[in-house]
């Protein structure tokens, strides 16, 4: 049985990112494996023994609530430290970092990603695409990554985190916008997402795993403890 943790869908479920858990479940079932989704709502403890965890996007207040809960509970941190895969989208990426800006203040993050997020004046909205860096646990990715971004965050990665992709379209992490008060939409944009240990995070909505089946299968393989090449192809 593959047990998929859908983390805080009541506060980090604004943009349909719950669909990532559905994609994982369906792609497992299509290969003949039993799989179930376990929603974990605000105020509930995060079980640390599930096979994989997904987090979605949300607005400022929701982010703060999510960060406070995940920090105080500690279950997701223990799961990630044990090597269980975690996949986070947009606000989820920011919440898992060291800090992020929300509601006019700097908020402590969970600390699973060496990343800090500042605010931008102009919202990044539109298609985003990148070539995988193949960093860390994403070494087997070969296909371009695509999604839809909608965020005001500019994220800088520290030395312990690596980008998921190198941008070919869109804003992605808008990493250079985090270093200055920039309103220019043409500010340098270099990277998309983050990879650190068992955590993969991205600004791609879509849902991301529906648009990027190879990434979905990579996460599925990690959750099942097998190599990506060992998963049977889906016709």
Tell what function each PLM region has.
Residues 6, 37, 112, 147-149, ...:
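Conserved beta-strand scaffold positions in the cores of enzyme catalytic domains, especially
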């Amino acid at each position: 049985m593959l047990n998929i943790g859908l983390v805080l869908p009541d506060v980090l479920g604004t943009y349909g990112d719950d669909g990532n858990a559905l994609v994982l479940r369906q792609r497992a079932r299509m290969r003949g494996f039993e799989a179930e989704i376990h929603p974990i709502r605000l105020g509930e403890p995060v079980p640390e023994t599930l096979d994989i965890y997904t987090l979605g996007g949300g607005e400022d207040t929701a982010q703060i609530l999510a960060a406070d809960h995940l920090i105080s509970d500690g279950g997701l941190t223990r799961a990630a430290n044990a090597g269980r895969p975690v996949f986070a989208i947009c606000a989820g990426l920011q919440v898992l970092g060291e800090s992020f800006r929300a509601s006019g203040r700097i908020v402590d993050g969970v600390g699973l990603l060496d990343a800090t997020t500042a605010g931008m004046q102009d919202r990044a909205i539109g298609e985003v695409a990148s070539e995988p860096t193949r960093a860390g646990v994403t070494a087997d990715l070969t296909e371009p990554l695509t999604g839809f971004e909608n965020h005001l965050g500019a994220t800088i990665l520290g030395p312990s985190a690596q980008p998921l992709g190198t941008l070919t379209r869109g804003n992605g992490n808008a990493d250079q916008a985090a270093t200055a008060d920039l309103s220019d939409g043409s500010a340098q944009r270099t990277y998309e997402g983050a990879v650190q240990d068992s955590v993969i995070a991205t600004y791609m909505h879509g849902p991301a795993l529906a648009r990027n089946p190879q990434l979905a299968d990579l996460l599925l393989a990690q959750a099942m403890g097998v190599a990506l090449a060992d998963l049977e192809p889906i016709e």
